[in-house]
Amino acid sequence: FGYGVGLDLTRRDLQAAAKAKGMPWDTAKGFDHSAPASELVPAAGAGDLVTRRLWLTVNGDLRQQSSLDDMVFSVSEVIHELSKLFALKAGDLIFMGTPAGVAALVPGDRFEAGVDGLVAFSGHIA
């Protein structure tokens, strides 16, 4: 098991259409390439997961940042609670939430996301 960082993208057009029909909006979260993510750092080498800074830049501008200890639940609490409900296995991804600053990404945007001292990755929106 390990830790990384990723983007949990939402297609707002699909979300709005589903909401208007009173339907679940799973398709707005599960489209192709909807969850770009970094490589994983083995849990044994991850160190402190309480006070590290989580951040996102878009086109070189800082859009989101927060300390992991500002999250509603800690990483260990989320894993503990989910493991009561699901058999967590290698390959499962758990997205923890996001700091303030959520905004649309548009084709051509370049992003970089990371957790200080742990991992970072970059990509672009096609």
Model feature map: region roles:
Residues 1-89, 93, 101-126:
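Catalytic-core "active-site belt" of small-molecule-metabolizing enzymes
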